[in-house]
Amino acid sequence: MPSHLTSPSRPRPARRARVLTAVVACVLALAGCGVRLETPPPAEPSPDAIEQVRGRTVADALALAGGATAVASGAVDDPVRAVLDDVAAFSARHAEELGGVYDSGLPDPSPSASPSPTASVVTDVTALLAALVDDAARATTDADAVPDPELARLVASVAVARDALAERLAAVTGLPRPAPAAGVDGDDAPDDATATSEPVAPSATATQDGGTSPDAGEPAPATQGAAALALAHDEAAWAFTVLAARSSDATRTSMLEEAARHRAASDAWARTAGVTGRPADPRRAAYALPAGLDDPATAQALPRSLEQAVADASAGAVASAPAGARLDAIASLRTATAAAVAWGAAPVPFPGMPELATALVP
């Protein structure tokens, strides 16, 4: 009997259609439930320590600018308005030089974010004065701690500018200057009275006798900054002594007091740099004086120039010092800035940073 070969069974078209229909239905169901088979959207990067300081200083600057503008729009006296205008203009410059508000280009996850606490409380002169004091203290602490030396120099300059604005606003309004609010950093920063005390040693290469170890090699940047500041103070001390000799009795006493203050500060920074009594000491026996010192205008301008030079060197010492050892240099910048203004210098938005000394045009 002939055998019958059975051919292999093949899927029927109807069965294939049913399977395909089921797959499509499953995909559509998943899509309807919000399931997406794709990569997640890019996340906002977490700011590092440097960006946190930069962003915080920018936010405070913008809040101060907005607060000063709001207060100035009310009924205030002309002297108060002049200071408020400087608060707004200086703070706008601060935010600009710091790079402004960070924008990652990603969609804002919280478009209705509330304003910062500082911005919400600046409604009058008293609140603005408190905000200036708090923000100056916070910037001082940030400048001391931030790892980036150039950002430290810039933030220190901003802190000193805010401190000077607070002094001016308190003076024209007759309001007492408040202490920083509880919880605001900066309470440990040296004040003007301690700016000439012994600064913190910048490096471990200094020996107990004030020199540097023979195998220390090239001076560390912190040592160079401290030595440059010692030189600026020494030149100021010498010039004030010359001015005292050329002054009347009424002015001679104040000139000699300034000379003594700068000489003490010079000695302190020289010891910090480890150059006292060594060939590396940059201080000199005498310094060049500007031509035409017999002209009263030239003689009156010299103290301003001397203090501004100390301020510039102080800002340089901030940048050269390691993080956590900058408070004395910041205090020196604050003192020199206040002294320059006392001798007739115009307030500037960036003390100690002559490269940013563009005059503000009303």
Regions found by a protein language model. Give the residues of each.
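All-alpha RGS (Regulator of G-protein Signaling) helical domain and cognate RGS-like helical scaffolds
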Residues: P2-L5, A14, G34-P362
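Sec-dependent N-terminal signal peptides
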Residues: R15-C26
